[in-house]
């Protein structure tokens, strides 16, 4: 028995030793696993940090490359301009020495020579100072910010600079045909032009090195108004006004004199084009009565080269307590929403009646959020969250907001059924309002900076948003969660959803690029930027994008003062990639908003220059300019349907002058004028 007991004890000891060894091995394995996991996580995080660093380095290199490219392009343009000036000066000197021996002109020049020395070579040197005047000061009237004075006062104050700057196109136009002729014909034409130059009697002709500021304007006859402006890319968009020096009745009457008011067919996509002269002169007093419509509160200037078949009229002016940052119509066009400081207003379009004023009293000063904040949504079935609303009579349903800080509503958007209104603000929140109860039913959180743009999907169950945090987010409104996040290199300023099924979303950003994604997969399908092969992209930040009504194109507006129409034929397989079809040049300051009419016949654009331009979509010609605000036109929107009757189209504008305005437009003699426009275009 003792041997059996001893064997049993020995077995137990061995089992205990095995158990202990197993426990030690398990503990060691767990320790190794934890250590390996830590090492693995550390290496992963380190590699992610390195990748992010590489990414940032690439972005910085790209930005540096763009800046260097812009600098080189500007330098090249400047050098080209200097070479052209030198060539013209040399040609003029050579021509002057030849023409100076002509017997018929010697007595005429000798009368003005006096103590001026060899004055017979002075007239050929006149173009050089005039061209330099255009480069030096001709840019100033358009680059400077608009002040609060009336446009007529600005024109009068800048008359001195414009008078000298207006002469450059004349010289260019006279000299360009000579470069295309054989030498003998050039000499004959030069002699003919020299004999046609009137000799001034108001002041003696100065030597080549003298001051010509006072003598040059007197040596150009009034009939030598420019008929076409051709300048290098660096100065093409800053051509000075010419209409200010012309008499009120000197509007062009024939097609030859009106060519510079129209865009040639082969230059529609070109970025650098001169601004049509009628857009440069904001003094409506100098415009013939048949080319303008003027009231105490606004005026309209028509393109002299096109029939005045469009009529624009102010319907309602809606006063606000602060800057109007955004305006948006409902899908049926019956209501208009406006966003300003802390409040969103909804108006009845037909009457201008205030239907609701929405504000969230719980909103406070925007606070920074953690980098890894979870994207969530808050819902509310009552008004206990501090939101307030007013009915059409202006009576508040709850206490007024006590917040002292500004909180501008940057974007508003109606749901397709018109029952809800989405608002985006500086506090990084998206609020969904029930317009019947005037309460917040959902709050979408996740953006880390100001929200600048919103757009509903046609189905109404999704919403896209763009923010300064460099992301575009798609929200599922059935669950209140973010279903897709798209990140780019710079802040997002504007977003839009394609019509129909909402298959694509477009976004504009501070990096001068328009991107188009597939809304289902998040794949980037088009990138429309200034680095394309043709160089037809935007040269500055893109502040507004909108799809055309047929969904086949995108319209964009930029701080480079241009509007562009991009076709999306590449998405349908017709072409390998999208391209710029038309560049609309006419604004004198930043383009802040763009919109299209229902049939895509017209494009509307609002600008910091306080104007709204109507563009013919296909030709790129500006049809008219509306000046109806005393500050920047921040937002433009066009209504669907005909809320003011079948004969009127309706659009609205929001401005920094604390006003939102509803306008109506109509066409007069549509069939007759459309035929005339077609003939002019052809």
Curated annotation (Swiss-Prot):
<keyword id="KW-0804">Transcription</keyword>
<dbReference type="InterPro" id="IPR001680">
    <property type="entry name" value="WD40_rpt"/>
</dbReference>
<feature type="region of interest" description="Disordered">
    <location>
        <begin position="359"/>
        <end position="400"/>
    </location>
</feature>
<dbReference type="InterPro" id="IPR013890">
    <property type="entry name" value="Tscrpt_rep_Tup1_N"/>
</dbReference>
<dbReference type="InterPro" id="IPR019775">
    <property type="entry name" value="WD40_repeat_CS"/>
</dbReference>
<feature type="compositionally biased region" description="Low complexity">
    <location>
        <begin position="221"/>
        <end position="255"/>
    </location>
</feature>
<comment type="similarity">
    <text>Belongs to the WD repeat TUP1 family.</text>
</comment>
<feature type="repeat" description="WD 7">
    <location>
        <begin position="628"/>
        <end position="673"/>
    </location>
</feature>
<feature type="repeat" description="WD 4">
    <location>
        <begin position="487"/>
        <end position="527"/>
    </location>
</feature>
<dbReference type="InterPro" id="IPR020472">
    <property type="entry name" value="G-protein_beta_WD-40_rep"/>
</dbReference>
<keyword id="KW-0677">Repeat</keyword>
<keyword id="KW-0678">Repressor</keyword>
<dbReference type="InterPro" id="IPR015943">
    <property type="entry name" value="WD40/YVTN_repeat-like_dom_sf"/>
</dbReference>
<feature type="compositionally biased region" description="Low complexity">
    <location>
        <begin position="114"/>
        <end position="123"/>
    </location>
</feature>
<dbReference type="InterPro" id="IPR036322">
    <property type="entry name" value="WD40_repeat_dom_sf"/>
</dbReference>
<feature type="compositionally biased region" description="Polar residues">
    <location>
        <begin position="145"/>
        <end position="160"/>
    </location>
</feature>
<dbReference type="Pfam" id="PF08581">
    <property type="entry name" value="Tup_N"/>
</dbReference>
<feature type="repeat" description="WD 6">
    <location>
        <begin position="586"/>
        <end position="625"/>
    </location>
</feature>
<keyword id="KW-0805">Transcription regulation</keyword>
<feature type="compositionally biased region" description="Polar residues">
    <location>
        <begin position="374"/>
        <end position="400"/>
    </location>
</feature>
<feature type="repeat" description="WD 1">
    <location>
        <begin position="319"/>
        <end position="359"/>
    </location>
</feature>
<feature type="repeat" description="WD 5">
    <location>
        <begin position="537"/>
        <end position="576"/>
    </location>
</feature>
<feature type="region of interest" description="Disordered">
    <location>
        <begin position="97"/>
        <end position="257"/>
    </location>
</feature>
<feature type="repeat" description="WD 2">
    <location>
        <begin position="404"/>
        <end position="443"/>
    </location>
</feature>
<feature type="repeat" description="WD 3">
    <location>
        <begin position="446"/>
        <end position="485"/>
    </location>
</feature>
<comment type="function">
    <text>Represses transcription by RNA polymerase II.</text>
</comment>
<keyword id="KW-0853">WD repeat</keyword>
<dbReference type="Pfam" id="PF00400">
    <property type="entry name" value="WD40"/>
</dbReference>
<feature type="compositionally biased region" description="Low complexity">
    <location>
        <begin position="172"/>
        <end position="194"/>
    </location>
</feature>
<protein>
    <recommendedName>
        <fullName>General transcriptional corepressor TUP1</fullName>
    </recommendedName>
</protein>
């Amino acid at each position: 028995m003792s041997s059996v007991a001893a064997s049993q004890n020995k077995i137990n000891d061995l089992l205990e030793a095995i158990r202990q060894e197993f426990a030690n091995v398990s503990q060691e394995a767990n320790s190794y696993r934890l250590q390996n996991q830590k090492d693995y996580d550390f290496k992963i995080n380190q590699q992610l940090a390195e990748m992010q660093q590489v990414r940032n380095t690439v972005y910085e290199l790209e930005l540096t490359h763009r800046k260097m490219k812009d600098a080189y392009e500007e330098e090249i343009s400047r050098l080209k301009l200097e070479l052209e000036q030198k060539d013209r000066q040399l040609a003029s000197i050579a021509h002057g020495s030849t023409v100076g021996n002509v017997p018929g002109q010697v007595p005429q020049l000798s009368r003005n020579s006096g103590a001026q020395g060899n004055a017979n070579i002075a007239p050929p040197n006149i173009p050089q100072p005039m061209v330099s005047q255009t480069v030096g000061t001709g840019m100033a009237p358009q680059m400077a910010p608009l002040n609060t004075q009336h446009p007529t006062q600005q024109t009068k104050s800048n008359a001195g600079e414009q008078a000298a700057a207006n002469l450059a196109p004349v010289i260019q136009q006279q000299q360009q045909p000579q470069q295309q002729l054989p030498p003998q014909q050039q000499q004959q034409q030069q002699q003919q032009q020299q004999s046609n130059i009137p000799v001034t009697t108001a002041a003696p002709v100065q030597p080549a090195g003298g001051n010509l500021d006072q003598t040059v304007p007197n040596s150009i006859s009034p009939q030598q108004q420019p008929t076409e402006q051709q300048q290098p890319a660096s100065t093409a968009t800053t051509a000075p006004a010419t209409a200010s020096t012309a008499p009120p009745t000197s509007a062009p009457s024939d097609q030859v004199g009106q060519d510079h008011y129209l865009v040639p067919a082969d230059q529609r996509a070109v970025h650098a084009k001169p601004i049509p002269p009628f857009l440069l002169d904001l003094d409506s007093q100098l415009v013939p009565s048949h080319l303008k419509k003027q009231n105490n509160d606004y005026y309209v200037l028509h393109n002299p080269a096109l029939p005045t078949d469009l009529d624009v009229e102010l319907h309602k002016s809606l006063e606000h307590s602060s800057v109007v940052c955004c305006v948006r119509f409902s899908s049926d066009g019956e209501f208009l929403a406006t966003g300003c400081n802390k409040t969103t207003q909804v108006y009845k379009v037909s009457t201008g009646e205030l239907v609701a004023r929405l504000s969230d009293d719980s909103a406070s000063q925007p606070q920074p959020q953690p980098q890894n904040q979870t994207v969530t949504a808050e819902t509310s079935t009552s008004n206990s969250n501090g939101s307030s609303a007013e009915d059409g009579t202006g009576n508040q349903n709850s206490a007024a907001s006590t917040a002292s800080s500004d909180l501008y509503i940057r974007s508003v958007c109606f749901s397709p059924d018109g029952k809800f209104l989405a608002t985006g603000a500086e506090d990084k929140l998206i609020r969904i309002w029930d317009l019947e109860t005037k309460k917040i039913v959902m709050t979408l959180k996740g953006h880390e900076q100001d929200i600048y743009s919103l757009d509903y999907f046609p189905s109404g169950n999704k919403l896209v948003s763009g923010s300064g945090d460099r992301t575009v987010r798609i929200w599922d409104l059935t669950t209140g969660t973010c279903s897709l996040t798209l990140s780019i290199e710079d802040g997002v300023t504007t977003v839009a959803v394609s019509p129909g099924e909402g298959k694509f979303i477009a976004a504009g950003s501070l990096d001068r690029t328009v991107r188009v994604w597939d809304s289902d997969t998040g794949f980037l399908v088009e990138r429309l930027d200034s680095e394309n092969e043709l160089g037809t992209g935007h040269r500055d930040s893109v502040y507004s994008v909108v799809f055309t009504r047929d969904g086949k194109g995108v319209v964009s507006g930029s701080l480079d003062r241009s509007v562009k129409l991009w076709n999306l034929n590449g998405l349908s397989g017709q072409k390998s990639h999208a391209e710029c079809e038309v560049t609309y040049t006419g604004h004198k300051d930043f383009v802040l908003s763009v919109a299209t009419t229902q049939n895509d016949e017209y494009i509307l654009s609002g600008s910091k220059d306080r104007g709204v331009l109507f563009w013919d979509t296909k030709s790129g010609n500006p049809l008219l300019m509306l000046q109806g605000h005393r500050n920047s036109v921040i937002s433009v929107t066009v209504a669907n349907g005909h809320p003011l009757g079948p004969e009127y189209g309706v659009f609205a504008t929001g401005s920094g002058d604390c006003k939102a305005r509803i306008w109506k437009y109509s066409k007069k003699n549509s069939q007759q004028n459309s035929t005339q426009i077609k003939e002019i275009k052809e």
